Amino acid sequence: MQESIQLVIDSLPYLLKGAVFTLQLSIGGMFFGLVLGFLMALMRMSPIGPVRWIARFYTSIFRGTPLIAQLFMIYYGLPQFGIELDPIPAAMIGLSLNTAAYTSETLRAAISSIDKGQWEAAASIGMTPWQTLRRAILPQAARVALPPLSNSFISLVKDTSLAATIQVPELFRQAQLITSRTLEVFTMYLAASLIYWVMATVLSALQNYFENQLNRQERDPK
């Protein structure tokens, strides 16, 4: 037991370095996933049929196939077509594309939940659809979308562990490398799991804090 504890202490700098990389990868994947997801949400609400179908097909593909398969096709499959990516860009692209499929549905539902009368009221005072979306609809939709988007981010933090399969040096990969040297399988994966748990717990606490702040503002707007 004492040897295992000492191993964890000695390995902690490497695990924490991997945890920082995990958070960076998650933040990048969430950012680009939100940008692309917002575009897909607008396409899903487009009055043009083919535009809606493209967005629906994209969402269906990336939500209906395993993330690990998507990462493998990007990192191991694209070189067959002359496109070679380093592990980190490949992971970022895969995580972003996958996240966008989920955030697009969240954003679309949030925007659709806003009373359509607000669109009509804004049009009656001369606002363009884009002005209405930006000034009136999105601020309200953001409140609706915050909880599910926060949950998506927490899930993404855990999903980055799949990037270890394409040699990205995030937390799980660091645990794998240490395990291969020490053969302490249970100890190292338990340590990595506890770090994931701490990150998820902190992120959940931040989510609750911001939700409470928004609810307080709604009850007592000043």
Regions found by a protein language model. Name each.
Residues 1-222:
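Transmembrane alpha-helices and adjacent helix-loop boundaries
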